[in-house]
A protein has these predicted regions:
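N-terminal signal peptide c-region/cleavage motif recognized by signal peptidases
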Residues: 13-17
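Beta-propeller-forming repeat regions
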Residues: 21-196, 201-275
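Positively charged n-region of N-terminal signal peptides that target proteins for export
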Residues: 1-5
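Cleavable N-terminal signal peptides
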Residues: 7-8, 18
């Protein structure tokens, strides 16, 4: 039987608040004129849990094809959903899997600012449904609400035709620029927005396409939100890891693929190996 061995990585076993460090931003004067980029998808992963503690869910909403993974911590099973969204209303249906062929429906109203999701879960045995109140899994007070504006350049030598080179972080409450992220060359079609270190604050993830890299290389640029400075800061430690971070908030684990699984525990990032 496999046992899990927690191996503290010298370069990575640091406080979660120290994942990031300040890296000077590139001044606009040092770069070419950048043009606004529209249609950039913000892939936001919301991690929510039910009030009674039975369910944990990773929810991707506000995109063309909203989807979710619902973990039933009592019955120890996972249900994947896909569906539609109109305004704040989500209507999701389960996707068949090897684990289960049962059909489930999950519908409800999502508050995009607070992360509260009032939902109704139904199946063949319970067509009336069970009311579930979801809330952020990692709650913090005064969490900022941001939106983004994107800028870049056309690049005929790049396989994507252009590159993302600047992100303006806009405070949604007063429509002011809270921060400008620069000094990078990124994939121009989408960014990730997720709580990578499970501290309750969302972080920014961009696919690095500098120096001939492509999306398939799975190299990423990380900006971790620091609530003390109220700024996003680059994380060279995370940027050394190859692989797309797959977050398992119910276990506080990050899976980068190829056996690279890290546990966030007591403010430390530890690598898990199986033997």
């Amino acid at each position: 039987m496999k046992t899990q061995l927690f191996v503290a990585m010298a370069a990575l076993s640091i406080s979660c608040s120290s994942f990031a460090e300040n890296i000077p931003n590139q001044t606009i004067a040092d770069s070419k004129v950048l043009q606004p980029i529209t249609g950039v998808r913000v892939s936001m992963q919301r991690m929510v849990k039910s009030n009674e503690g039975r369910y944990f869910m990773s929810l991707y909403a506000g995109i063309n094809n909203p989807h979710a993974e619902l973990y039933d911590l009592v019955e120890n099973k996972t249900i994947k959903f896909k569906g539609t969204q109109k305004g704040d209303q989500l209507n999701l249906k389960s996707v068949s899997s090897e684990e289960s062929t049962d059909t489930y429906q999950l519908s409800g109203v999502l508050n995009a600012n607070t992360g509260l999701f009032k939902a109704l879960l139904s199946d063949q045995k319970n067509t009336f449904g069970t009311s579930i109140q979801f809330e952020p899994a990692f709650k913090v007070a005064n969490k900022p609400v941001f939106v983004f504006k994107f800028y870049g350049q056309n690049d005929a030598t790049n396989p994507y035709g252009k590159t993302l080179q600047r992100i303006d972080v806009i405070n949604k409450n007063n429509n002011t620029v809270a921060q400008t992220l620069t000094a990078f060359t990124g994939y121009p079609n989408s960014i990730g927005y997720m709580d990578i270190n499970f501290d309750g604050y969302y972080d920014v993830l961009v696919s690095d396409v500098s120096n001939g890299r492509q999306v398939e290389d799975k190299r990423y640029i990380y900006w971790m939100y620091n609530p003390k400075t109220q700024q996003f800061q680059r994380s060279p430690q995370l940027e050394k890891i190859v692989g797309l971070p797959n977050l398992h908030g119910e276990k506080r684990q990050i899976d980068f693929g190829n056996g690279q699984i890290y546990q966030v525990e007591n403010g430390l990032l530890n690598k898990i190996s199986n033997e």
